[in-house]
Amino acid sequence: MGFCLTATNSKYSFDGGYGGFALLRQNIANAWDTEFGDHYATLRLCFRKSDYDAFNKEAERILSKERFADGGEKSNDQDIVDFLFASDCAGSISPKTCKKIYDIIKDIDFHGEIFTYATHSDGKDYEHLKDFLLDCYKRRAKARWY
């Protein structure tokens, strides 16, 4: 049981466990905004309702800062937030969001870090992901996971 990230008529398909998908989104959150990424990492530590309530309160506090408000440098990034909090089981992102994520991670060297099943990985998961995201944008295809 796990996730599959792909797009219609794509030569790319990423299969992994939910932990790998969480790691992928954690790395994107860190690259997008350091403060938010640091907080997003604590989501894995939530076990009780009170943990989630505290997490949500702090997430709202961070996202209410000027850089996320109208006119701020990240004011048009609600789709990134939506991606980070979407269901692990099924979801999709638009070609425009694929391009945004590509732009966020394109210059990062992930040093062979993987998010797919290790037995299926060539150690270049993030390099392939960058190509996949750009391909989705160019072909106007939604990226989807299930």
Ranges and model annotations:
Residues 1-146:
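Acidic (Asp/Glu-rich) sequence patches and key acidic residues
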